[in-house]
Amino acid sequence: WQRQVSVRNDGNAGTGAYKTTATFVKPNFLREFDSFISSFEIHNDSDPEIGAIVASTSYSFPLKNGKRFITSYAYGEREYVEYTDSLRDISFKTHHILGQFEKTIYSSKNQAWNAFVGLNINRTDSYLSGVRSDLVVGASDKGWVRTGHLKAGLNFNGSYKTKSWSGSIYGMQGINGISEDFQRADFAEDGIIPGEARAVGAKGNLAWTIKKGVGLNLGMSGQIAMNPLFNSMTFGLGSNAGIKGLPGSLTSGDSGWLGTSELVLTTWQKNKKAFQVVPFLGAGGVHTDLKSVTTKDAVGAGGIIARFIQPEFVLEIGWV
């Protein structure tokens, strides 16, 4: 088994700034070339009170002719423990199921392209003082909503001399029949029709070793919605999306963009130990069109990180 534990202070507002994650990976779990991943995440505030718990598993099963099937399940609970007003009585439970086929369509010494198509199903239950309540779009007065969508596209990665890159191009299509009748009626009040929700997007990352001890990492992504989307199809901004110095999930919208950059300066290195200074900058924006109402938001952050690398752990201290 391969194990990794991380402790960070870029959790989400309300559920707690401190985020502890434990990840376990087992290659060749049931057969050769398969893999099993299990992850546990806890958010807490400084009291400490637990504001969120997320548990997930993923299994990748190799098929013939460069094909793979990936299935995953995630369960989460969220409470706003940092607040002292009525928001503290709000809580959510979420389920996410994914089934995805992948196929390697091109592979060479320095690059690879994979095609994928996956089915995503999500359910959210919302509560006010422990009673199911209409707190999310689509939930109606029954207090729960289920949605599903297809996502298909291409993943790619490659390298050449001092540069390496990766990214994806994708399209998403909502599925009408996964939501209940009362949920579709609730969505319609906001101009959302699950079966007509669709979007396209792309993302890319570039790592460039400029010279010994100096590296540059760049990232860009964007999404365009053709019609109003439900929550699981939206474009999110925060540290989970790559913008360092922000809460994990700060804002989201149907369409959006983001860009990130960091300069990695390795000031000392010996064997497998190193000390790095990393200035970083990131920004993004989102917007949503619902009937005659348009909402927009933009965020950004910049700062510097001191990173100490040991064979068994990595320590980062940052200023934003």
Region spans (language model):
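Transmembrane beta-barrel strands of outer-membrane/channel proteins
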Residues: V5-N9, T20-A22, F36-I42, T57, ...
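Outer-membrane beta-barrel initiation region
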Residues: W1-I70, S107
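Residue-level signature of outer-membrane beta-barrel architecture
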Residues: K26-N28, F61, K103-I105, L154-Y160, ...
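Outer-membrane beta-barrel domain signature
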Residues: N9-T15, N44-P48, T84-I90, V137-V145, ...
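Transmembrane beta-strand segments of outer-membrane beta-barrel domains in Gram-negative
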Residues: S60, R68-N217, Q223, H287
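Repeated loop/turn-to-beta-strand initiation elements of outer-membrane beta-barrel proteins
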Residues: Q2-R3, F29-F36, K64-T71, S107-W113, ...
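C-terminal transmembrane beta-barrel domains of outer membrane proteins
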Residues: D186-V320
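Transmembrane beta-barrel architecture of outer-membrane proteins
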Residues: K19, A52-V54, T94-L98, T147-G153, ...
